[in-house]
Amino acid sequence: MAAAAVRDGDPGPTQELLVAWNTVSTGLVPPAALGLVRPRKRAAGPRGVPGIRPWGSLGSPGSPSLASPAASPPLHPFPTCPRLSAPFPSPLCVPSLRSSALQASSRTSGAVPPKEEELRAAVEVLRGHGLHSVLEEWFVEVLQNDLQANISLEFWNAISQHENYADEPQCLLLLLDAFGLLESRLDPYLHSLELLEKWTRLGLLMGAGAQGLREKVHTTLRGVLFFSTPRTFQEMIQRLYGRFLRVYMQSKRKGEGGTDPELEGELDSRYARRRYYRLLQSPLCAGCGSDKQQCWCRQALEQFHQLSQVLHRLSLLERVSAEAVTTTLHQVTRERMEDRCRGEYERSFLREFHKWIERVVGWLGKVFLQDGPARPASPEAGSTLRRWRCHVQRWFYGIYAGLRIEELFSIVRDFPDSRPAIEDLKYCLERTDQRQQLLLSLKAALETRLLHPGVNTCDIITLYISAIKALRVLDPSMVILEVACEPIRRYLRTREDTVRQIVAGLTGDSDGTGDLAVELSKTDPASLETGQDSEDDSGEPEDWVPDPVDADPGKSSSRRRSSDIISLLVSIYGSKDLFINEYRSLLADRLLHQFSFSPEREIRNVELLKLRFGEAPMHFCEVMLKDMADSRRINANIREEDEKRPAEEQPPFGVYAVILSSEFWPPFKDEKLEVPEDIREALEVYCRKYEKLKAMRTLSWKHTLGLVTMDVELADRTLSVAVTPVQAVVLLYFQDQASWTLEELSKVVKMPVALLRRRMSVWLQQGVLREEPAGTFSVVEEERPQDRDSMVLIDSDEESDSGGGGVAARRVVPDLTGLCPQLFWTYIQAMLTNLESLSLERIYSMLRMFVVTGPALAEIDLQELQGFLQKKVRDQQLVYAAGVYRLPKSCS
Amino acid sequence: MKVKIKCWNGVATWLWVANDENCGICRMAFNGCCPDCKVPGDDCPLVWGQCSHCFHMHCILKWLNAQQVQQHCPMCRQEWKFKE
């Protein structure tokens, strides 16, 4: 009707316009907002706004408490809008307008806002004057001012009360109240917003599109309200959301008949069971964390729901809760992970976590009001939830991979058992970009935990083998292995016993690297002879996967993929000759020093190695083994001949020989030795028998090798010993002459003085000889009390050896090393007296440095020494603690 | 003191009783084997000629087979006869 008046040429168009404007302005915004323009002192107003009141009792715009600013009616319908102030003089300056303005406002300042039709009519009038274009802008402006001056302050005021509340239920109520207040304040605006949108749709207003206006309003709202958010507010929100999640999770558990669906599935794990019972027994509610009697889970859920609804209506949901939700999720995921996964490699956690994530997403649906049948999932809502799920999953993969990467060294160490962890990690790595992190972290862990002098070579090799197995599962292209384990290979190259350890492992001699023997006996080994060079000869083209970016382009992918443990180990040195030579000398040692070798096993090993290294390099070893077999046959032959002879022609003692093909064995040390007459005769007899057996061939004895068992009969005791021929010969000279000077003996034996002295040390050790004065040796026919100590040692030593009970006794085969450990024992005692305490490795390396008493002694390896020392510990001649050996107090 | 030896396990290498180290034909050590063989000793024996030169049996046989007319010792060019 107003529009009609305009068209009819009504005499008071200005007045009519003003009336219309007043109608619209008072209709659209709450009167308080219009009062704003007046004295700035209003700015202090919100302080006076009544504080928090119980939910529901908040005043509505018309309620007396809020009516105070409206008591003086809005006289200025055009607040701070400079563009408007020019064409529209302030109503204050137009006295004639005042009454109608008052009239209009008095109508609205009552409980009843102007009817929609009235407003619409007024808008029509404005439209007639072309003013409709500014209406929206004005609306936003007013809202912004109101927010700045009143609402925001009021809201934060209410929030700041939370400092008085320590416990969560109260905080939650407060938050609810504060947002309720906010909503009630904004309610008129939102209502008007709807009207404006409607008019825009009807074409009354120009609008920037309805969506534009709404967005603008919400942006303003968020901008002004959260222009500066106090830290404490964020913290409170976060704490409450954390609680909400826990309450929700707990309620889900309870909701399904009291059993915990999550725990049910995993009650088989002892850990989970323990945790479950702890939960049952705890007096506190797992959800809200308060006493079970005072559990407020139910209220909490309701209140959270209300809060979410309020926030949703205000479009503040994302703004207020997104950050808190994110932080909470991160925190909870991390906690859960630390709690369950750390150190636990033997089962996969992926499925469990996927289930858990689904439940978390259920919670998110609750937070963002997108679940429940009441609200049909709109595509938009679905996408939000999808986004969140994606986020949670990615976050989970990221930190799970991070955790596993951090623990990778331990995982690798435990490998066959930790396979689930490796597979989890593989799955996660495919989804996160943490390859570099993995490489760096693993390398660092290797450097600090493995590659230092404190670790046995054999342990390093064992770990390397596990790493090969584990990382192959993780990365079939083997690039991670290649890159991360390069330090191990580099380091192993610097250890001198690497080859020996690997070879020993291959032949199943050492305990630590037994895997290698198994690996060796696997069928279809990758031959080291012919690296498969052809690039794409194997597999379906469909299955082809490119190499990772960090692969070394210089190496062919298929070769890398096909390399197995043994070829990787052997390639540490880049050449297999080293290994073959080492194997050969190791085999020689075993054959010559351990008369108790097992031919079948050695033959099997050689055959297996032939598969790997090829026929030709192993040829020498084959001949060596054949020599052993031939020798046995020849010995049996000769023995048979001997037995046919009459008793008087029988040799005084049995002579047996291992007859070697010199060209095929590693070179031997050649020691000259003048053998006493009777022995030489016996050996020559044997030699003649051999010559008879094999025409045109003869024997050359190697006295440094071999084993002589004999009884040494002294006045008061008899020793039964097994020594090398040289040692035996030396003692034999003492039979005829009880005392020798070193020089004399050296001339007779034809052995350099220094060497002779070393050889004789065994007998000094045994208490058979003594050096008195220096350089003169004589037989100790009767033991003197001060020598008794060492004699006791020997007795106990031999006893436990022959008993064969312990590990040590099995390892230190008595008749092969004979007196050797005993010899070491003096050295060890001297070392420990001087240096107090030493580790096994230290003792070993010092022995190797100082004790060079012949091949038989150099033979002892770390394990044997360890066995020997352990025996000493058992006999209480040594004390072992904290990784070092020391002498017991009384002994020193 | 009396030492009573119970058992003497010695180690020895075998060698051909020959006046040379290497086979004059293949230049390999007598104590090794000829290039065609894998195992020395019984499987790759030496033979002596009446000229007192000796060779791996396989080597000299190969040589003799290659000789068209008369069979000479490759070292001294005397007629080759196996030493009985």
Swiss-Prot record, chain B:
UniProt domain comment: The RING-type zinc finger domain coordinates an additional third zinc ion.
Protein name: Anaphase-promoting complex subunit 11
Functional description taken from the UniProt entry: Together with the cullin protein ANAPC2, constitutes the catalytic component of the anaphase promoting complex/cyclosome (APC/C), a cell cycle-regulated E3 ubiquitin ligase that controls progression through mitosis and the G1 phase of the cell cycle. The APC/C complex acts by mediating ubiquitination and subsequent degradation of target proteins: it mainly mediates the formation of 'Lys-11'-linked polyubiquitin chains and, to a lower extent, the formation of 'Lys-48'- and 'Lys-63'-linked polyubiquitin chains.
Any one GO biological process: anaphase-promoting complex-dependent catabolic process
Binding site for Zn(2+) 2: C51, H53, C73, C76
Name of the gene: Anapc11
Pfam families to which the protein is assigned, alphabetical: zf-ANAPC11 (PF12861)
Modifications the protein undergoes after translation, according to the UniProt entry: Auto-ubiquitinated.
Organism: Mus musculus
Pathway assigned in UniProt: Protein modification; protein ubiquitination
Keywords: Cell cycle, Cell division, Cytoplasm, Metal-binding, Mitosis, Nucleus, Ubl conjugation, Ubl conjugation pathway, Zinc, Zinc-finger
GO molecular function: cullin family protein binding; G protein-coupled receptor binding; ubiquitin protein ligase activity; ubiquitin-ubiquitin ligase activity; zinc ion binding
Binding positions for Zn(2+) 1 per the UniProt entry: C23, C26, H56, C59
Family affiliation: Belongs to the RING-box family.
